[in-house]
């Protein structure tokens, strides 16, 4: 049974969404309340070195409709609040498992039939633990797929509002908007577990895809740390694999949205990929990567997100400053605005983009 604060939080989120009105391009999403629950494999940590305090798994309350908000970003904001209320979601911990269940329930409530993919991983001290990916598929007019991915774990010192409840929130909101729409391509939403521990979830998924599934994947879209940083970016490889990045930049220009890119930059740290796009890039799958940071600060390597007078010398991710209370007080309106822009961009990718 959920604790009273979980119930109150979810009732508040769903009441807000249900009372919202929707623009003509975003019809209300009808939710079939008769969809049976999905059986989930348990993911129990085995002696992790940074075990988070256990929490009861949140439950999404039944609703006749779960309509997109009046403004893009409203739903994403609600998911950030819910995920950070769970606490730090350390890889392999009970809190990570609760967050995965929250995402599974959210997809189910929207009318998807999500699946889980469990895997084993090892922490820095050699302890084995279990995590899982949560996967939901929106069939499109083409069987070719766009993978949209966001990790749902966090660092052990952080509630992970920016890194990466923000990415999950954007993904879940777009999933809500498009569930009843025709899309040019099939959209495969994946919430990755254990990103903070060597990108475990994305690497496991990519390793077991099989060559046919890789060949069928048009592009991977990575959503990570979207709420805090000063500037809004979309990255990719250069050359022929930059087709979606260039499309997004042109679309953003047409819609007066401040998305930019950094070209010819090595998006690795000491030769290692730094986010979930890496597992796909290694296998020849094109990617784009949405992120908010500031490449003009610090060592100009993208790690310093904001002016060094804020956060931990400009760092929000992996610090105690990565929470909504601090972000809202320090950067009023930023979280909501970033959610609006990134939801708009991902919605356009899913509903408008087509290869020539």
Predicted regions and their residues:
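Intrinsically disordered, low-complexity Ser/Thr/Pro-rich tracts
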Residues: 1-82, 109, 126, 356
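N-terminal capping segment at the start of a domain
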Residues: 60-97, 110, 153-154, 313-326
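Extracytoplasmic/secreted proteins, especially bacterial periplasmic and envelope-associated proteins
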Residues: 71, 75-78, 82, 94, ...
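Structural recognition of the beta-strand scaffold that forms the well-ordered cores
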Residues: 79-82, 115-116, 133-137, 145-149, ...
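A non-catalytic alpha/beta surface segment that caps or lines the substrate-entry region
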Residues: 82-139
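Solvent-exposed loop/turn segments at secondary-structure junctions
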Residues: 89-91, 113, 120-124, 141-142, ...
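Acidic/histidine-rich catalytic neighborhood of metal-dependent amide-processing enzymes
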Residues: 154-247, 259, 277
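Active-site-adjacent substrate-binding region
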Residues: 232-356
């Amino acid at each position: 049974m959920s604790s009273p604060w979980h119930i109150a939080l979810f009732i508040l989120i769903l009441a807000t969404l249900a009372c919202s009105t929707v623009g003509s391009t975003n019809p209300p999403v009808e939710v079939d309340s008769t969809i049976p629950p999905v059986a989930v494999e348990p993911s129990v940590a085995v002696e992790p070195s940074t075990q988070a305090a256990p929490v009861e798994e949140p439950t999404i309350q039944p609703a006749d409709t779960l309509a997109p908000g009046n403004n893009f970003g409203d739903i994403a904001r609600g998911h950030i609040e819910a995920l950070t209320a769970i606490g730090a979601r350390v890889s392999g911990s009970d809190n990570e498992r609760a967050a995965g269940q929250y995402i599974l329930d959210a997809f189910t409530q929207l009318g998807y039939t999500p699946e889980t993919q469990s895997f084993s991983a090892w922490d820095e001290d050699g302890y084995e633990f279990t995590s899982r990916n949560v996967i939901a598929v929106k069939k499109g007019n083409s069987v070719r797929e766009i993978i949209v991915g966001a990790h749902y774990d966090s660092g052990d010192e952080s509630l992970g509002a920016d890194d990466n409840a923000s990415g999950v929130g954007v993904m879940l909101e777009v999933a809500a908007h498009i569930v009843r729409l025709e899309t040019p391509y099939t959209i495969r939403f994946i919430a990755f577990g254990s990103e903070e521990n060597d990108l475990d979830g994305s690497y496991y998924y990519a390793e077991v895809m099989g060559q046919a599934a890789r060949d069928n994947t048009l592009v991977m879209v990575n959503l990570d740390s979207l709420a805090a940083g000063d500037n809004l970016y979309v990255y990719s490889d250069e050359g022929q694999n930059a087709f979606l990045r260039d499309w997004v930049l042109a679309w953003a220009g047409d819609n007066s949205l401040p998305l930019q890119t950094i070209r010819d930059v090595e998006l690795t740290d000491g030769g290692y990929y730094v986010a979930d796009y890496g597992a796909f890039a290694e296998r020849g799958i094109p990617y784009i990567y949405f992120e908010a940071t500031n490449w003009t600060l610090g060592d100009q390597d993208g790690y310093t997100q904001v002016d060094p007078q804020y956060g931990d010398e400009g760092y929000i991710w992996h610090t105690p400053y990565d929470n909504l209370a601090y972000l809202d007080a320090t950067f009023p309106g930023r979280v909501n605005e970033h959610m609006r822009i990134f939801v708009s961009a991902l919605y356009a990718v899913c509903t408008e983009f087509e290869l020539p």
